[in-house]
Curated annotation (Swiss-Prot):
Protein name: Suppression of tumorigenicity 18 protein
Entry similarity comment: Belongs to the MYT1 family.
PROSITE patterns xref list: ZF_CCHHC (PS51802)
Signal peptide: none
Localization, UniProt: Nucleus
Function: Repressor that binds to DNA sequences containing a bipartite element consisting of a direct repeat of the sequence 5'-AAAGTTT-3' separated by 2-9 nucleotides. Represses basal transcription activity from target promoters.
GO biological process, one term: negative regulation of cell population proliferation
Length: 1045
């Protein structure tokens, strides 16, 4: 791509250069022949890797535009123009160092390759044209003309470069899209900076000296400026070609030609009349020959050659860097777009990221160019393979951000990130920790084994459809199940690991019977009239699915990554809005094995101990009592999608059928199931209404129509709901609504179980006629089953014993019809109020054809217990559950009645006291006076207390002041004592040598006496002392002078 751009640039830029090609060919092997460009071209030919231009443009920064010929911003181009201008004004000293032979030396061995050279870039052509122009000036015929042209060209180049610089600044202010005439063909920001530095270091002084030289020699060389003549000179045309706008460089006629021939022919044609026109021009002044000017021009040309060659080499390095970035981003895109390709279910394999080749370790790095991994959110460079946590994300174009959006998603279609092993959606970029992917993998393995062992074929009328056609044979009154354990275990393996349908489990266990609904857009295909459907077969309790929004179809295996249909979101919204009231769609699950599993009614039994049985092992199917039918009925229905074992929604009826055979530990045969005929179902009093309803919609509900497949995400939303009715997931033990799929940690499960126990257990009443359970010794109506603690049983001191007729009441006898109480396990007739210990009930249970109908005594248990208080409808109870309220303890109406009774008792006591004369007027007055006196005395005492408190506070303040004064006095005394001790020691030391008459030497023992004697002597100075005494006093004065008080 870069080679094509260079050829086009060479082709368009070399059209206006007037240089004779015959003279340029000997100079093509100059040392500055752009070796880096040839090396890059050789590497491209060796690699031969095509680069997608669209992807490479997306990966490159915004300022990079290869279709414009690798043009840079106007600022960089201005710097390069300044470089060219600086090169034109070189110093005279450097020009004198380089000779003409050194600059234009050409080896003789390169003459054989003159005609085979190609011009790889425009700077190479510019260098060779300028070099040839220097050689042209050696000839004596045009020596004077060339000297004049050199001086004028330098001045004109300086003026034009200044004009171009000003023009480029104006265009850059207007905008980037405006093209100005100062753009060089190859430049980069790094090149401009380095060239400007080199110009400042090496040629900065030369520009100044050249300007000074031209200024001094201006009067000597007076040339007339003619624009037309300057444009016809080859040197000027070669320099002015850089300033031609890009719009004039593209020629439609020359684009189809060879790049070499297209620029060689106009050069030869235009170069011939150039110098005759210059010689004929009479506007040029004749000056004397000066070799210094020629050498100066040669030095300028050599410096210009070096600058252009350096710029070409750096431009090649710049394009090589972009080429590496293109390859890196192509590899990264190829790695990111390896997503799981899911094929059709007809036998093709599934390719996921697990089977795709693992990328190399060195490629697991940040995709942002120039990012070394520091400052990432993850803090670990090898694990950062996306743009989400990179601090340099703002510098990435929007196209790259759009390409890397899929990295942040789970690759499993329909997965929202819930239930992952690492519980983080952003870090989940593979199928390893996704529960939906694991379920699909299991489904594929089961589907493969299922397709191998399948015995059913496609329906001939629907053979053109892609989806498979299943056949289900519903055999009513068929033979008993006698399949061996090997085949039964093989069938059990197929249906062992399937998702459980909690919605239908709620419908079966908790007694919810929503209306039969079908999904929108589902239409049952009409049945063809046949003998098989003359007597239509109805399925009393088919396997219901989780609802219309969770149809028993998994998404197709060929569903591509990133496809999210609208019905997925609609179904998800329906699943969220329909958590509390789940709709049951009575559809029969289609499989490749003929089967029809029946679900029984919503009877939950409570045994004699009050324990709720949730094992679903009641009403076991005994095939011995079911007579076989003569001709089975077969229904062939087209399935909407290839059926997998994982798409089977297992509800309570399915597990009942599993448990009703021989228990959970025995293999079960799924090949056939048994049902009832219409006559038996119509005789059944419980399921009669349900059968009538299902007669109308049996065909519509049992055959799902071909509907667009729903994602397993909708199925998952239904499965993660709490099975407790009315539970929104709050208050669970686990603290996570999504992980709560059982009743074990639900706070509402206890209330629900209590309500079920109360709904299915017999009402426990007090046997005393007219007793509502209030006032019992135990305080609990439910535990009161005898007359021992009943207050009404001993009313009036009469012992009320139940009569024979009362014992035979329906509440006290066995609920089994025909049982007289004999043979019970408890051995006591009166305490036998359930069918658990009745031998007749066990016998009838064994003989009963298990058709899903409850026993006769179980029908009597369906009556719900009610509040015993007359007029109470169950509202406002303490436990907020009417079903479990069987006493007056939590009834609000009873509480109001009790309050009224207490108030009436208090009024009665007041009335009795008033009538007894206790509350007389005189006594009340006397008591009032005493109370007044007490109040007055209390006020006086309070006033005295206030006075005492004020006195106490004043005394306390005085005491504090006295204590502070004492502290000050003590401190002054201590200081005085210290000072006295110091003075005494000083006096003793000073008077140690002086001895008073009649006294010994001074010391601490006689210090006071010594001081007293001295005071007496000094106080009686008026007396006449002997000269000895006066001398002694003088000596004492001299000794005491050193003491300072």
């Amino acid at each position: 791509m870069d080679a094509e751009v260079e050829d086009k640039t060479l082709h368009t830029l070399s059209k206006g250069t007037e240089v004779p090609m015959d003279s340029l060919i000997p100079e093509l092997r100059v040392p500055y022949d752009c070796s880096m460009a040839k090396k890059r071209r050789a590497e491209e030919q060796a690699s031969g890797v095509p680069i997608n231009k669209r992807k490479s443009l997306l990966m490159k920064p915004r300022h990079y535009s290869p279709d414009m010929g690798c043009k840079e911003s106007p600022d960089n181009r201005n710097e390069d123009d300044g470089l060219l201008e600086t090169n034109d004004h070189a110093t005279a000293d450097e020009i004198m160092v380089k000779s003409m032979d050194e600059t234009l030396h050409l080896p003789a061995q390169d003459s054989s390759l003159q005609k085979k050279d190609q011009y790889t870039c425009y700077p190479e052509l510019m260098v060779k044209s300028l070099v040839h122009l220097g050689k042209f000036e050696e000839s004596e015929s045009v020596q004077t003309t060339c000297e004049n042209l050199n001086g004028s060209s330098i001045q004109s180049l300086k003026a034009e470069s200044d004009e171009a610089h000003e023009g480029s600044m104006v265009h850059s202010d207007n905008g980037r899209d405006k093209v100005h005439h100062s753009q060089p063909p190859f430049c980069s920001s790094g090149d401009s900076e380095s060239d400007s530095d080199s110009a400042e270091n090496g040629w900065g002084n030369g520009s100044n000296s050249s300007e000074d030289t031209d200024t001094h020699k201006g009067p000597k060389h007076k040339l007339t400026y003619n624009r037309k003549d300057l444009l016809e000179v080859p040197e000027i045309k070669a320099e002015d070609d850089k300033f031609i706008p890009c719009e004039n460089r593209c020629d439609s006629d020359t684009d189809g030609r060879d790049p070499q021939n297209s620029h060689m022919e106009p050069l030869v044609v235009k170069a011939q009349p150039s110098f005759p026109e210059v010689e004929e021009g009479e506007s040029l002044a004749t000056v004397t020959e000066e070799p210094a000017e020629v050498e100066k021009a040669k030095g300028n040309l050599s410096l210009l050659e070096q600058a252009i060659a350096l710029q070409a080499e750096r431009g090649s390095v710049f394009h090589h860097t972009y080429k590496e970035l293109d390859r890196f981003f192509l590899d990264h895109l190829a790695r990111e777009r390896r997503q799981p390709r899911v094929t059709d279910a007809n036998g093709r394999q599934i390719f996921t990221n697990k089977h795709s080749p693992r990328p190399e370790r060195r490629e697991a790095k940040c995709p942002i160019p120039g990012c070394d991994g520091t400052g990432h959110v993850t803090g670990l460079y090898p694990h950062h393979r996306s743009l989400s946590g990179c601090p340099h994300k703002v510098r990435v174009p929007l196209e790259i951000l759009a390409m890397h959006e899929n990295v942040l998603k789970c690759p499993t279609p329909g997965c929202t990130g819930r239930g992952h092993v690492n519980s983080n959606r952003n870090t989940h970029r593979s199928l390893s920790g996704c529960p939906i992917a694991a379920a699909e993998k299991l489904a594929m393995t089961q589907d493969k084994s299922q397709l191998d062992s399948s015995q059913t074929g496609q329906c001939p009328e629907q053979a053109h459809r892609v989806n498979l056609v299943k056949q289900i044979e519903f055999n009513f009154r068929s033979h008993a199940i006698t399949s061996p354990r090997a085949s039964a275990s093989k069938e059990q393996e197929k249906f062992g690991k399937v998702p459980f349908d909690y919605a239908s489990f709620d419908a079966q266990v908790f007694g919810k019977r929503p209306l039969l609904q079908t999904g929108q857009g589902q239409k049952a295909p009409p049945f063809p009239e046949s003998k098989h459907f003359s007597n239509p077969v109805k399925f009393p309790n088919g396997l219901p699915s989780a609802g219309a929004h969770t149809q028993s179809t998994v998404r197709a295996s060929s569903y591509g990554h990133g496809q999210y249909s609208e019905d997925t979101h609609i179904a998800a919204a329906a699943a969220i809005l329909n958590l509390s009231t789940r709709c049951r769609e009575a559809t029969d699950i289609l499989s490749n094995k003929p089967q029809s599993l029946r679900a029984k009614g919503a009877e939950i039994e409570v045994d004699e101990n009050g324990t709720l049985d949730l094992s679903m092992k009641k009403n076991r199917i005994h095939d011995k009592s079911i007579p076989p039918t003569s001709s089975p009925t077969t229904i062939t229905t087209p399935s909407s999608s290839p059926f997998n074992a994982s798409s089977l929604l297992v509800n309570a009826a399915f597990y009942q059928a599993l448990s009703d055979q021989e228990g959970w530990n025995v293999p079960i045969n799924y090949s056939k199931s048994h049902g009832k005929t219409e006559e038996e179902k119509e005789k059944d009093p419980v399921n009669f209404l349900e059968n009538l309803e299902e007669k109308k919609f049996a065909g519509e509900a049992s055959i799902p129509s071909p509907k667009p497949k729903l994602h397993t995400r909708d199925l998952k939303k239904e499965l993660i709901t709490c099975p407790t009715p009315g539970c929104d997931g709050s208050g669970h033990v686990t603290g996570n609504y999504a992980s709560h799929r059982s009743v074990s940690g639900c706070p509402l499960a206890d209330k629900t179980l209590k309500s079920l126990m109360a709904a299915n257990s017999q009402e426990l009443k007090c046997p005393t006629p007219g007793c509502d359970g209030s006032g019992h010794v135990t305080g609990n109506y439910a535990s009161h089953r005898s007359l021992s603690g009943c207050p009404r049983a001993r009313k009036g001191g009469i012992k009320m014993t139940p009569t024979k007729e009362e014992k035979e009441d329906s509440e006290l006898r066995c609920p089994v019809i025909g049982c007289d109480g004999q043979g019970h396990i408890s051995g006591k007739y009166t305490s036998h109020r359930t069918a658990s210990g009745c031998p007749l009930a066990a016998k009838r249970q064994k003989e009963n054809p298990l058709n899903g109908a409850p026993l006769s005594w179980k029908l009597n248990k369906q009556e719900l217990p009610h509040c015993p208080l007359p007029g109470c409808n169950g509202l406002g109870h303490v436990n907020n559950v009417f079903v479990t309220h069987r006493s007056l303890s939590g009834c609000p109406l009873n509480a109001q009645a009790i309050k009224k009774v207490k108030v009436s008792e208090e009024l009665m006591t007041i009335k009795l006291k008033a009538t007894g004369g206790i509350d007389g007027d005189e006594e009340i007055r006397h008591l009032d006076e005493e109370i007044k006196e007490l109040n007055e005395s209390n006020l006086k005492i309070e006033a005295d207390m206030m006075k005492l408190q004020t006195q106490i506070t004043s005394m306390e303040s005085n005491l504090k002041t006295i204590e502070e004064e004492n502290k000050l006095i003590e401190q002054s005394n201590e200081s005085l004592l210290k000072e006295l001790a110091g003075l005494s020691q000083a006096l003793i030391s000073s008077l140690a040598d002086i001895q008073l008459p009649q006294m010994g030497p001074i010391n601490e023992q006689n210090f006071e006496a010594y001081v007293n004697t001295l005071t007496d002597m000094y106080s009686n100075l008026e007396q006449d002392y002997s000269p000895e005494c006066k001398a002694l006093l003088e000596s004492i004065k001299q000794a005491v002078k050193g003491i300072h008080v």
